[in-house]
């Protein structure tokens, strides 16, 4: 064992796998820390700051290890996934974790901490009074046209529960707050780039604590998390766009109101100072990890006193709130009896910046400014149907998608929380449409694209020439090990241009797109014009020990060809806009080659099955996976496959893979199928990751492909079920990364992976606008396209759809029998065309074109195809619908409990199979 140890940390589920719990040396070779744990199962590892192979420890290379109180457990070096140390306290309390190094061996032991001792104070306890505060409460905004008023909308989407549930908010800077209701132990932490300073908080009414464990209920609101008591309530709000949190308490009657925040600030290692309206805690730079704020300014919206206290004065801070004896214990009291008391905590890297944030918070009534900006966000892309449950789920999916937008390393979208708190190229651009574009956040979308484009590999001698990073973990650490991240970005460039009409950006981004195409032609193009790649370089990228792929999909996967095809389509449009005739002509020829050869190589005419990939030796792999659906949904212009083949693709995939709770990553009839993802003794979790496990984001293109071919009612059943996941399971208000394929209880699904995943919620939100409403703006051609695929249960709705420079299309709909009534009103000043495609029940569809000016109405008989409208310059065209009877009749499949997957009967079956084959190493 190396004698010079780095600082080691306990990283686990209780601290977001962060640097909250460093181990301190207490004796030679012995290191310990004290943590507060609730009576749940907690998973963790012992690791250095970067989780290096040499300094990452658990109890077993593959399996989980259950720790027993007061018993030493041997440690081994391992970086695996799913092989954590597990500990489940019988009751909430503080626990000492001791790691001991002896020679070449290491052990860990957990014991109940005997005392929560406060150290001898090395400075005086502060008492500071703020006698006057200039505070003007902000008034609610006027209702937005076509939308519910703010209080009505917030009340409709509020989620109330009387039992504990987890939740998460993001600050859109570099931090997020994960919490749990009805508890004080591990009840929440506001995590910055590294570490945390603010945990949970307690509110007091006339000196009596509001006990969260006994709250009547907890309410997840669009703007915060509220606990309700008999005659009062308290609320946590994380402010969007800055490092600020607001802790609030409300009382039905004027009372003395107080707040105590849980602060992870050691009393003896902090300096304290005052300013006009509050106090500032300052930490030594040596104690602040890179990117973490060093100063915390605290203020309130009413006259108040700030008192640093001890456990002897307030024992409930130890017994009920579970504060650490080492840390500051700050009471903030209102000077007068009040019905509302807001406390702001503002985090910054300089004291002056922290104070400035605090003063601004009071002057602007920041908590309500934040609240009403959320209202305007929700109204910017608005859909309100007669299905209230679906409305709520869509609103929460949109809100949840904002959790991941950040500016940690420039504008980006984190992939997932807690352990994918990085900007992944693939994930970012799959999520961009449902996070930014549908919500009218066009400048944000442009900033994210520009940021990734600036990191494009421009070294012509590199194998990654033309690629943007797959993963950005810092401004100097970028990984380019993906073949699809850049094509997804180029696809979103085209979506951005069509939503915004930004022709200037079409010129700016063209060299980036051209460089990518050149890079593919130089290194990755086969004789058929198809794009080649390594086995693990698709989204199914899990590898054994970081070397051999669990789900090999080289060297030509079907989704990669669809993305390559879409990239060429986008490049051709950009070449035309930039008057690059030679490039346009060359790429058009290549595009046609891809289209014809893709069908001949991938489509089996005899079996009517699309290959998942073509191997390097030319063999087709006909594994039934959901990827085939992307060959239909990825292209934004002319389709890659004919409608006849497309309907077969949908039928094949959905009939084999779609359960009521999501679409499997591999058919249950496949030999490699794994029915469960995590916590299995028979196999490593990564063997199941893409071999059966359900991915939330795959539901997005499943809904799109079903709606494309007339399966919108089954798609909507899936959306409804996913909506229940968002509003009632796991971390409430968001979606997890994964689910087990086989589920025994629809009402209590087994989730896995990250507790919140960007593309899961963004795809759910995207489906509402782009698929059910069928809104596809085409501003490059001065046209708005609507091709609604409305579920039959929708009888009426209102919608606001953003496009251009702050413009909206307001839409209302009602249905009476076969008669559909549409009303359109656009806000743009310039003339624009409307293209409306309406599906008839007779197998045809009517395309309506006209000038979008003022308010226009359309009446449509879906049975007869009769249409009435007051559209100017009306043109109509009748076409054959691509709706498929076979798709419209599809139903969910179910787990086949009669089969016993090989993965369950033969331990490590897939790992042994792969290691016995001659797979090429793919080390990044």
Protein language model features and the residues they cover:
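Non-catalytic carbohydrate-binding regions of carbohydrate-active enzymes
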Residues: 122-129, 578-614, 644-765, 769-805, ...
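Extended, well-ordered alpha-helical scaffold segments
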Residues: 357-370, 389-396, 440-454, 503-522, ...
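Aromatic (Trp/Tyr) and acidic
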Residues: 142-191, 322, 551-554, 620-659, ...
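Extended glycan-interaction surfaces of carbohydrate-active proteins
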Residues: 347-351, 380-423, 447-481, 522-556, ...
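Intrinsically disordered, low-complexity polar regions and short flexible loop motifs
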Residues: 4, 50, 61-112
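Aromatic-rich carbohydrate-binding modules that target alpha-glucans
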Residues: 2-41, 49-78
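Terminal accessory carbohydrate-recognition/targeting modules of carbohydrate-active enzymes
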Residues: 109-384, 441, 711, 723, ...
